[in-house]
């Protein structure tokens, strides 16, 4: 590496592979197999490319209005970003500046640790229980803030709202960020707690339930005072972070939310069926409220199953460097016919 002063050394986030093969089944990055709403496709077709000569809006007012009506909050409780990763990254800059350690789980979304390192925020990883669950009392006591994925990734396990409220009630002098990327696959949102806990900040994405991972739109929900701090950070980095096309297509998605409720139900039904089928093959399957399952094979190693699935152009996620789940595979939930093909391949591999 070239030797120059001031170069930053950091361990970056490692994303899942993005293969592009015609007959593959891609189940490694929790994308939505059903695709965007037809209204999104219509909005894309009707978009006037001449509009791209102008900068996008600063506050995404129309999208905020639609989201506010959908969620039952006011527009001043919302901020839109370039994916929920953008919102979460800004949250580290906006909320975690006390000098005390920020708390998050030892087995959760890998970006949290990366952002803490990047922004030089002290942190402490709280071990999940032996059953991969969050124990609320582990988050009591002095800290510089908390960030929890609920449901968690990569485990898929959901923390009941009552237990989440225990954490909020015990940390009212610090911001508690709840990452709800997967909340619409069976969990109960923390939205009802917003009026009681001004220290609560929720993040959401259009990548999972709205099938717009390639568009990069996410949002944060919280007390107007928290939103004001977030907007100040956003305007200090890139006030135009949400492009015009993304805003228009996200708006079309919100306006056709019944479509996503329907596809979400289909994903949940397929997930529950697939989990039962894996359990019948002696897999240990963690209870999931997401669009994926984390499962441990017992008749074959996770590494071998991962390799043999990949040879069949079936891509799942393997975490060989994560000690607690190195014997597990994370498998996204596709359409029923895709999952039947995957199940048949797993049966063939496990019986050979």
Curated annotation (Swiss-Prot):
Gene3D superfamilies linked: Aspartate Aminotransferase, domain 1, Type I PLP-dependent aspartate aminotransferase-like (Major domain)
The protein, known as: Histidinol-phosphate aminotransferase
Keywords linked to the UniProt accession: Amino-acid biosynthesis, Aminotransferase, Histidine biosynthesis, Pyridoxal phosphate, Transferase
Signal peptide positions (record): none
Quaternary data: Homodimer.
A matching Pfam family: Aminotran_1_2
Modified-residue entries (N6-(pyridoxal phosphate)lysine), positions: 208
Keyword Cell membrane tagged: no
Recorded catalytic activity of this chain's protein: L-histidinol phosphate + 2-oxoglutarate = 3-(imidazol-4-yl)-2-oxopropyl phosphate + L-glutamate
NCBIfam families documented for this protein: hisC
Name of the top EC class for this enzyme: transferase
Membership in a protein family: Belongs to the class-II pyridoxal-phosphate-dependent aminotransferase family. Histidinol-phosphate aminotransferase subfamily.
An MF annotation (GO) of this entry: pyridoxal phosphate binding
Family matches, as CDD domains: AAT_like
Enzyme Commission number: 2.6.1.9
GO biological process, one term: L-histidine biosynthetic process
InterPro entries: Aminotransferase_I/II_large (IPR004839), HisP_aminotrans (IPR005861), HistidinolP_aminotransfase (IPR050106), PyrdxlP-dep_Trfase (IPR015424), PyrdxlP-dep_Trfase_major (IPR015421), PyrdxlP-dep_Trfase_small (IPR015422)
Gene name as annotated: hisC
Cofactor(s) of this protein: pyridoxal 5'-phosphate
Pathway as given in its UniProt record: Amino-acid biosynthesis; L-histidine biosynthesis; L-histidine from 5-phospho-alpha-D-ribose 1-diphosphate: step 7/9
């Amino acid at each position: 590496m070239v030797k120059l002063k001031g170069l930053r050394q950091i361990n970056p986030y490692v994303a899942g592979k993005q293969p592009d093969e015609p007959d593959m089944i891609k189940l490694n990055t929790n994308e939505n197999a059903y695709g965007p709403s037809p209204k999104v496709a219509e909005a894309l077709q009707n978009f006037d490319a001449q509009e791209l000569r102008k900068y996008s809006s600063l506050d995404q007012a129309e999208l905020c209005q639609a989201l506010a009506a959908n969620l039952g909050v006011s527009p001043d409780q919302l901020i839109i970003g370039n994916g929920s990763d953008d919102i979460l990254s800004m949250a580290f800059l906006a909320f975690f500046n006390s000098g005390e350690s920020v708390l998050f789980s030892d087995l959760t979304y890998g970006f949290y640790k990366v952002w803490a390192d990047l922004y030089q925020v002290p942190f402490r990883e709280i071990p999940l229980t032996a059953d991969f669950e969050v124990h609320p009392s582990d988050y009591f006591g002095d800290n510089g803030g908390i960030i929890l994925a609920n449901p968690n990734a990569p485990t898929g396990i959901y923390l009941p709202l009552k237990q989440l409220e225990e954490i909020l009630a015990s940390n009212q002098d610090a911001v508690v960020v709840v990452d709800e990327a997967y909340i619409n696959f069976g969990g109960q949102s923390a939205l009802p707690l917003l009026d009681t806990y001004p220290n609560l900040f929720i993040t959401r994405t259009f990548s999972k339930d709205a099938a717009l991972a390639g568009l990069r739109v996410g949002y944060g929900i919280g007390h107007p005072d928290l939103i004001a701090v977030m907007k100040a950070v956003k305007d200090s980095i890139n006030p135009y972070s949400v492009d015009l096309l993304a805003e228009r297509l996200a708006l079309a998605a919100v306006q056709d939310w019944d479509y996503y409720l329907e596809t979400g139900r289909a994903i949940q039904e397929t997930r529950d069926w697939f989990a039962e089928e894996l359990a019948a093959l002696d897999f240990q399957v963690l209870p999931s409220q997401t669009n994926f399952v984390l499962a441990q094979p017992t008749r074959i190693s996770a590494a071998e199953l991962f390799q043999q699935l990949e040879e069949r152009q079936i891509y799942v996620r393997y975490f060989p460097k994560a000690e607690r789940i190195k014997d597990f595979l994370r498998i996204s939930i596709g359409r029923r016919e895709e999952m039947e093909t995957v199940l048949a391949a797993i049966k063939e591999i496990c019986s050979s």
